[in-house]
A protein has these predicted regions:
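N-terminal secretory signal peptides
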Residues: 1-27
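Extracytoplasmic ligand-binding site segments that recognize negatively charged/polar headgroups
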Residues: 57-68, 80-98, 103-231, 235-238
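A ligand-binding cleft/hinge motif common to bilobed small-molecule-binding domains
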Residues: 114-118, 240-259
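Periplasmic-binding protein-like
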Residues: 153-154, 182-192, 214-217, 223-224, 256-282, 295-318
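A bilobed periplasmic-binding-protein/Venus flytrap-type ligand-binding module shared by bacterial periplasmic
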Residues: 159-164, 202, 272-284, 303-304
């Protein structure tokens, strides 16, 4: 990458001049997308000769490992080396490796869709369109040049502790969180620490206005860092309601009989997207293509849903019973380019409002 490893993520993204337009993470079309490719015996044999695929991901480790083991079971002779860390670290690691001409990773996943815009602009991703992506993915969830597609989708939601809040008294909207009865009872994550919450904060200030956050700040909220923290505080009963946080954590807790319940705000819930892509100079190109086809195919997507509590845009993936289908939920519109363009000002304004 033509970047300096010491630069911050946002400085690198701003310097890239990345541009998005309209769709979840559509980028300016620079070339025609390649034709869709099915999984063939020739590809499988070539992948087996390579013997390995290296996967950098920000997906929760148990979910990433389940995906890897399922792939290995389907394609014996090919191992998956999972390197899991946060999205920020994934981005920094790729930048450091490529600036040193080290090509160690095959397939990458990040919970920050804007990373893929940078990698694409730097010319280090390779086009590859799995057959199932071409057939079953909406246009807005695949790069028009075929360089990445939505591997996982989730929401940042409101939720409450069912031991502390009766269903009929629970908030139904973001506006409800401003009711004085919730003062001192709300937990919230920080956009300065969490990419998920930065994305959610951008969407919420765009749709609800900064006045919402100014009023929320008067509610004496518990401020935490990661998007995984509000569900934990909720589960422990340290707060009755969370204003934001990962939907998938709430699913996992609820299905483990923990006292939590999701709420889908009437104004819409922020939508978060985490794509997958393949690097052009990867060491195992055939194994990378086979793994990408598996991860983005129905089998990999169903595993994400069942094990990870995640959503999928694959048209044939089945929602898990007991969860509200994504198609029935009003969501806010994702715009990674705007998040990166306005990220520093969003963070600064948030800090001023909440004094944290």
């Amino acid at each position: 990458m033509r970047k300096h490893p010491g630069l911050s993520r946002r400085a690198m993204l701003k310097g890239s001049g990345a541009v998005l337009a309209g769709a979840a993470f559509s980028t300016r079309v620079m070339a025609a997308a390649p034709p869709a490719e099915p999984v063939t015996p020739t590809l499988i044999e070539a992948a087996r000769k390579e013997g390995q695929v290296v996967y950098y991901t920000s997906t929760d480790l148990p979910v990433a490992e389940k995906l890897a083991r399922a792939f290995e079971a389907k394609y014996p002779g090919i191992t998956v080396r999972v390197e899991r860390t946060g999205a920020e670290r994934v981005f920094q690691r790729v930048g450091q490796e490529y600036s040193s001409n080290i090509h160690a990773v095959d397939v990458v996943n990040s919970s920050d869709a804007a990373h893929f815009i940078v990698w694409k602009r730097d010319g280090i991703l390779t086009p590859y369109v799995p057959e199932e992506v071409a057939r079953y993915y909406p246009d807005e969830h695949r790069d028009p040049d075929g360089q990445f597609a939505s591997f996982r989708v989730w929401l940042s939601i409101i939720a409450y502790n069912t031991n502390l809040v009766k269903a009929e008294e629970a908030p139904k909207s973001f506006a409800d969180l401003l009711d004085p009865k919730w003062k001192g009872k709300i937990v919230k994550a920080h956009p300065g620490y969490s990419g998920t919450i930065m994305t959610a904060t951008y969407q919420m200030q765009r749709d609800l206005g900064w006045s919402f956050f100014e009023q929320l700040a008067k509610q004496n909220i518990m401020q935490v860092q990661s998007s995984t923290d509000p569900p934990k505080k909720l589960d422990l009963g340290e707060r009755a309601v969370m204003a934001d946080g990962n939907e998938y954590n709430i699913f996992q807790m609820k299905e483990a009989s923990r006292p939590v319940e999701p709420v889908y705000a009437t104004e819409g819930s922020p939508l978060i997207v985490g794509p997958n892509g393949i690097f052009k100079d990867c060491p195992h190109p055939n194994a990378a293509r086979l793994f990408q086809s598996f991860a983005l195919g129905r089998e990999g997507q169903q595993l994400n849903i069942e094990i990870g509590g995640l959503r999928s845009v694959h048209a044939q993936a089945q929602e898990k019973a007991g969860r509200k289908p994504l198609k029935d939920i009003k969501t806010m519109k994702d715009d990674p380019a705007a998040v990166e363009r306005e990220g520093e000002s969003i963070k600064s304004r948030y800090i001023r409002i909440f004094r944290v």
